[in-house]
Each structure stands twice: as C-alpha cells, then as structure tokens.
C-alpha cells in the first residue's frame, strides 16, 4: 500500500461551491497536469487550491522523499469552514443578514 500524502487549506475565503468547481478539474490528474490546469484557470479558487497542492507536493518531498513526477491527485475534498454574518441596513429601518461563507480543501496525493 502506498503512502497517502495530504495537505489542508482551512478557512479559505471562497465558498465551497466555487472551490468545488475548480476541484473537479484536477481530481485524478498527474500533479504536473493539475498544476498546469490551476495555473491557467482564471478563478480565485484556483489560486487557493494551487497553494494547497504545492503544499502537498512539498510535504511529499520533505517528509517522505517522494519525487513529484510520480505523484497524482488521489482526491480533493471540499467542505464548509465557517460563515461570517454581517448586517446590511436597508430601507425603512429594516436590516438584512449577509453571509460570507468560507471553505476548506484537503488535497490527497498518491504515488503511481
């Protein structure tokens, strides 16, 4: 059984739905191909997931001595982190709640 290398990004300032759109692009791909997809994707979530992917690659090199050329993205887990709630004043003395959602990402790599 190969070693699963993981990296987490917690409290990322993007909603889980937006993160999941980008995560679908790299699931099951080689690490080099996944990094290229994220580099040319024009979404903010791509930058956030790219940081987590690079962290997982660095973990593989530093902790396990695994070469990045042999790695592929086994799974990308996207979940809810927390929600900041704000109040926006509206007309006639009313107020509305604004929810600023945060997401979390776990990238797991496996050696081929």
Swiss-Prot record:
GO terms for biological process: translation. One of its GO terms (molecular function) is rRNA binding. SUPFAM superfamilies: Ribosomal protein L22. One of its GO terms (cellular component) is cytosolic large ribosomal subunit. Keywords: Ribonucleoprotein, Ribosomal protein, RNA-binding, rRNA-binding. Pfam families: Ribosomal_L22. The keyword Endoplasmic reticulum does not apply. It comes from the Bacteria. The keyword Ribonucleoprotein applies. CDD domains: Ribosomal_L22 (cd00336). PANTHER family: CHLOROPLAST 50S RIBOSOMAL PROTEIN L22-RELATED (PTHR13501), LARGE RIBOSOMAL SUBUNIT PROTEIN UL22M (PTHR13501:SF8). NCBIfam families: rplV_bact. This protein binds specifically to 23S rRNA; its binding is stimulated by other ribosomal proteins, e.g. L4, L17, and L20. It is important during the early stages of 50S assembly. It makes multiple contacts with different domains of the 23S rRNA in the assembled 50S subunit and ribosome. Belongs to the universal ribosomal protein uL22 family. Part of the 50S ribosomal subunit. This is Large ribosomal subunit protein uL22. The gene is rplV.
